[in-house]
Amino acid sequence: MYLSPSKITLALCGLLLTAAQALASQAGWRQITIPGTTADAVPITAVLYYPTQAVARTIAMGPFTVNVSIQTAPEAKVKGLIVLSHGTGGSELGHSSLAEALAQNGYLVAALRHPGDNWQDRSLRQTSLARYATARPQQASRVIDALLQDPEWKGRIASDTKGPRVGAVGHSAGGYTVLALAGARPEPSRFDAHCNAERADDPIFCSTGNARLSVTNDAAAAPLIPPLTDTRVRAVVALAPMGALFTAASLAQIRIPVAVYEAQQDRFLVPRFHAEWVAVNVPGVEMHRVPNAWHFAFMDTPSMSIPSEDGDIAANPPGFDRRVFLGQLQRELPAFFDKAFN
């Protein structure tokens, strides 16, 4: 078939316009507060990242930098809702580049600040293991409740015959959180069993703040863990997850798409006890091993040194380029959810 030069030019212009439109979305940003409930009176602060046509700008927020358009109008429809759960003592801003990438690709992202387990308030870590293990997934489910009922958002979130498209991403204790939403069940007695046997090889998990959550502080821990599965969640990504608490049987019962990322030099949550334990038990898991990466490779690099039980959160092993790796993750996460929902 012959195409005249003018038709070729028009076709190319159309392709360029389509490409420009595909990349036109920026990340909008706004902070919300989710009121307390009868069961849990503590409100939840969350940041929403969403696709918008407004121009984004680079803004420093504490030790992190975001590239967003604040309080601007969202697009009429979003591909789905993604809940983002930070690690213990973390922040709703610590994974902003991943949230921005998902928003630029059409998703509404709700990054919550876990009450009692964030950089300002670690009171949840002073409670029993049963309370800690229960509270985090329930907090994430409250965020889903709020946004699926919100008049501004409920009509924007894409749905199909299975219902609204909802996914979740979590890092570290956030990885635990999203796996619990997917159906993995924690068993408090596994903490003492694991640390009695493996403390020397998993020292940070067993010897820092989590040690206060020992089952010995909770005489009736196992019966206190209610079902945590949120059947609205249809795909999850667990980044360097805390996985040793989960039973193999419950991991084997997960029936939604799961991606697990392992930092191969992780000393905070040693992979063979956590990420790999999850990966060998979840059917059809998509496993990614990140060479030469430490535990905090999945977080944006802060502008200042932030100490942790495993050293400076801003530091990287020699030869590891966090910026390049996060760029890869910013492509892979939207692709994972696109595939899971379609």
Per-region residue spans from a language model:
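Domain-level recognition of soluble alpha/beta enzyme cores
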Residues: 25-84, 94, 104
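Short substrate-entry loop that stabilizes the transition state in hydrolases
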Residues: 71-79, 84-122, 267-269
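Cap/lid segment of the alpha/beta-hydrolase catalytic domain
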Residues: 89, 93, 113-138, 146-147, ...
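Alpha/beta-hydrolase active-site loop
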Residues: 129-160, 192-206
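Short glycine-enriched nucleophile-adjacent loop
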Residues: 145-148, 175-187
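Short beta-strand/loop motif that positions the catalytic acidic residue
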Residues: 254, 260-262
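Short alpha-helix in the alpha/beta-hydrolase fold that links the catalytic acid
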Residues: 256, 270-280
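Catalytic active-site module of serine/aspartate enzymes centered on a nucleophile-bearing elbow/loop
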Residues: 304-342
